[in-house]
Each structure stands twice: as structure tokens, then as C-alpha cells.
């Protein structure tokens, strides 16, 4: 079984630790995309990778952040997965109540910590393999090459560093492709804050999919809300995290 790990990289020290020298990635093909000079949006790098591959390739593609660290053997975990679905370790789902209230939930689990390894903690809720979600977090998306080629799936390059995997999931859903959780032990070395660009990119996704209720795993963002409430939801979650860290 062929597995290709694709990462857009600016911090090669972090990439080496989390991906290239990680024993749980042994046997995988590494496809790092050097982004130190261009600082292009991550979808640009991912799409350039897809354009470079054979249309007949038979492989699992693991699109992941440079600071996403698998903690169990990828090859063993991808055996017998349904090639007709998208897969990821952590995502989000919503339940709409009374047509207006959106109940939000993280689905799947991942450890996360700061860049220096401090404040390590588990987030999300454990679920069984194949549990459906609406969207995955951008830290990791697993998809078979045949599904991408057959459905002409690509990443939206307007979304530079946020929500590009969420967008990918929604676009795939419109083609009848489900997003499902693969329980996978991993650590995301990124406890960063929400940047101002996030709100512009979130507005873009809302306009692109006006009838979709999408969820942003890192920020509690729900499609369809007034912008002031979306921004408030981010600030509330950030406050709760700071309180927990004290």
C-alpha cells in the first residue's frame, strides 16, 4: 500500500520532528513543499502536488500540517479503509435546532500543545471508525488518489491558510462523498490564536455555500450566523481555553 504525506513547510525543524523522522511514518513517501520564500497559501502547494501526480496512481494521500505528528503507524491504520470517503482524525458536526440554533460538537480526538511542547492536552470526543462529520480540521485530511482523480477534487486557492479542508469537505459532499472519522493517535503542535484573516476567509466560505452549515474545528465557527456572533463565538472559546490553561 502506497502512502504519500504532503505538507507545505516553512518550519523544517518541526517538519523533521513530526513527519520525516517519525518512526510511525516509516515506509511512507514524503512530499514536502518548501514555502519559506513564496509563503503561498497552502492550497496552492496542495494543488501543485496533485497536478504533478499520475492520473493512474494508486495511493493514499495524507495532506497534513508540518506540525501534525502521528503517534501510531499510518500504514496499519489505513488498511481496509473505504476509498470512497474522505478521512481525518478530528472534525466537527452540528445539529440545527428549531431551524436557528446550531449545536456544535468536536468529533474525534487529537492531542494539542504549543510549539514548545507545553500545555499538552487532549481535545474532542472519542468515536468509532467511520463516524460521519461535516468537515475536518485542516491539520489532516486523508483521501485516496482514485477518489480525487475521478471527481476532479481540488483545493480552493482563495483560502490561503484557513478553512481549505472544510471547503474541500463541503465540495466533496456536493458530489456525494462522505467525510468520516479515523480514530488516530496524533499530536498537533499548534496552540495558536485565530488570525484576522480567518474572518475574511470564513465570510468567503459562507458566501460560496450559503445553504451549508459548516463548522470550523479551531474556532466554533458555524456557517449561517451573523458575522458579529461568529466573531463572538471565537472570543468566547479563546477565553475558555485561557481559563483552562491557568
What are these regions (language model features)?
Residues 5-27:
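Short, well-formed alpha-helical segments that are part of the catalytic scaffolds
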Residues 39-53:
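Glycine-rich, basic loop-to-helix element that forms the pyrophosphate-binding segment
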Residues 58-69:
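Short beta-strand-to-loop acidic/aromatic patch adjacent to the donor-nucleotide binding site
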Residues 69, 73-109:
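Conserved donor NDP-sugar-binding/catalytic core segment of glycosyltransferases
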Residues 120-143:
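A recurrent flexible, glycine/aromatic-enriched loop bordering the glycosyltransferase active site
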Residues 135-138, 150-170, 179-188:
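Donor nucleotide-sugar recognition loop
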Residues 180-205:
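Active-site donor/metal-binding and catalytic loop motifs
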Residues 196-215, 219-246:
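Non-catalytic, C-terminal membrane-associated alpha-helical segments of glycosyltransferases
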